[in-house]
Curated annotation (Swiss-Prot):
ZnF start-end (B box-type): 91-132
Keyword Coiled coil on entry: yes
Binding of Zn(2+), residues: 96, 99, 118, 124
Zinc finger (RING-type) boundaries: 15-56
One Pfam family matching this protein: zf-B_box
Alphabetic keyword roster: Coiled coil, Metal-binding, Zinc, Zinc-finger
SMART domains: BBOX (SM00336), PRY (SM00589), RING (SM00184), SPRY (SM00449)
UniProt gene name: Trim60
Function: E3 SUMO-protein ligase that mediates SUMOylation of TAB2 leading to inhibition of NF-kappa-B and MAPK pathways by suppressing the TRAF6/TAB2/TAK1 complex.
Listed name of the protein: E3 SUMO-protein ligase TRIM60
Any one GO molecular-function label of the UniProt entry: zinc ion binding
């Protein structure tokens, strides 16, 4: 900015009272500007109206407004004044201190500004020099490139900061959501436990009433028996004193008197089983997931297995294959490729709308003879619209609340438990308890419909989180 114009602006920013740059400028009703502190001194010393120091217009104390725009302009002019002073100081150093000549050259080797006489001296003899304007233009471009690089780096850092900030917000939202979800789950567990508590109390009360009713009936029977026996005893004692013939005629009544059978009192056993969604089923799925695939060597000839050995379906056409003792021939079934003889394993099977299916495990010597399912075979299956059955030591029919289209199977070999879960509502379907002593192989009965049966694969968990 031109120095004359700057001087005019500086004069505009001078306070009429203190003759210095205005501090915290305020504007009176007459339109003149003053320092707030200066104007306050006036109304502290005077009573009544204040007269403007410039135009002598009267106005009451505190009847002014702060001029923020004028304050910003004053600060800007101060900054320009400082810059102008700095530029003047720099211009004062453009003359060579040795020879009092203008500095017009730049020594590339020594990176120093020189006058003409300095460039001819022995100190800079043979050095490449160029005009200051040319050197400054080149170095300005270098600096501009460096500035652009720095700006780009700053922009990248700012973008990363923004991303991290969004992640922090996301983590906070996720943590808040998890808190809400935990509160909801705890509330559901409390409701479930309260419902189970009331149901078990009611069932126990009904069992108590039933037992007391049976016991009272038994006591009445005993009392009747005792009364009859006492009456007969009196009669026999009376006959005992009579003749032999009379005694013998009454004897058969004693033989016909039978004591009632003892009444066995048994209380019902109660147990509480938490639903799968509250008993760590999600952790079981993540931590103990087994890579189960179908074994082609054991598959029935009419079963078609996918390339990844995760899907299988029944085909009507009978293919020409070589007979194998390992294959199932009587019905469309097959085993898994890998057997289990230790540890805990989980796999999940999609049965969809198949009308018939059976899932479970069997021992290697399992012959597939349906008449001998109590040995080496533990499974559940569907054989009709609403008919489900367990195969094993005990054949039991059951009816799920929700029809399962996906079944989760969890084997705890050491504990001797094989559990089946309905993954549609995450409820427990059935649990076998046994002492396993040999290798167990996943078993699959497909049925004769065309719909496929599929082994599902869940994403592999991050083991570092456990």
């Amino acid at each position: 900015m031109d120095s004359t114009a700057l001087k005019i602006l500086q004069d505009k920013c001078i306070c009429y009272i203190c003759s210095d740059f205005m501090e915290d400028p305020v504007t009176s009703r007459c339109g003149h500007n003053f320092c707030f502190a200066c104007l306050r001194l006036l109304w502290d010393d005077l009573q009544g109206n204040i007269f403007c120091p410039v135009c002598q217009t009267p106005f009451p104390p505190k009847s002014f407004s702060r001029n923020y725009q004028f304050r910003n302009m004053t600060e800007t002019i101060r900054l320009l004044q400082k810059r102008q002073s700095k530029r003047k100081r720099q211009e004062e150093h453009t003359v060579c201190p040795k020879h009092d000549q203008p500095l017009v050259l730049f020594c590339v080797r020594d990176r120093d500004v020189l006058c003409t006489q300095c460039s001819l001296s022995v100190e800079h003899q043979g050095h490449y020099t160029c005009p200051i304007k040319k050197a400054s233009s080149y170095h300005r471009k270098v600096l501009e490139s460096a500035i652009a690089t720095l700006k780009f780096g700053v922009k990248q850092v700012e973008e990363k900061l923004a991303v991290q900030h969004r992640r922090v917000l996301g983590l906070r939202e996720e943590a808040q959501y998890q808190k809400i979800e935990i509160r909801y789950e705890i509330g559901q567990i409390k409701l479930f436990l309260q419902s189970e508590y009331e149901a078990h109390l009611n069932e126990s009360h009904m069992e108590e009433l039933r037992s007391f009713s049976e016991l009272n009936g038994y006591l009445e029977t005993l009392l009747d028996h005792v009364s009859t026996a006492k009456d007969l005893l009196k009669e026999v004692e009376a006959i005992h004193e009579r003749s032999d013939v009379t005694l013998l005629r009454a004897y058969h009544k004693l033989q016909n008197l039978k004591s009632p059978k003892p009444w066995l009192f048994r209380t019902k056993q109660y147990g509480l089983s938490l639903p799968a969604q509250y008993s760590g089923l999600s952790r079981i799925i993540k931590q103990f997931q087994a890579d189960v695939t179908f074994d082609r060597d054991t598959a029935h000839p009419q079963l078609v297995i996918s390339e990844d050995r995760k899907s299988v379906f029944y085909k009507e056409a009978w293919p020409c294959v070589c007979a194998s003792p390992q294959k199932f021939h009587l019905w469309p079934a097959l085993l898994g490729c890998k057997g289990f003889d230790s540890g805990r394993q989980y796999w999940e099977v999609k049965v969809g709308d198949k009308p018939r299916w059976t899932l479970g495990v069997c021992q290697a010597h399992f012959s597939g003879d349906w008449s001998n399912q109590s040995s080496g075979f533990w499974a559940i299956g569907r054989y009709a619209e609403n008919s489900y059955v367990t195969y094993g030591p005990l054949r039991t029919e059951f009816l799920p609340v929700v029809r399962p289209s996906k079944v989760g199977i969890f084997l705890d070999y050491e504990l001797g438990e094989l559990s089946f879960y309905n993954m549609n509502d995450r409820s427990l379907l059935y649990t076998f308890r046994n002492s396993f002593t040999s290798t167990l192989w996943p078993y699959f009965y497909i049925g004769t419909d065309s719909e496929s049966l599929e082994i599902l694969t869940h994403p592999t968990p991050d083991t570092g989180s456990y």
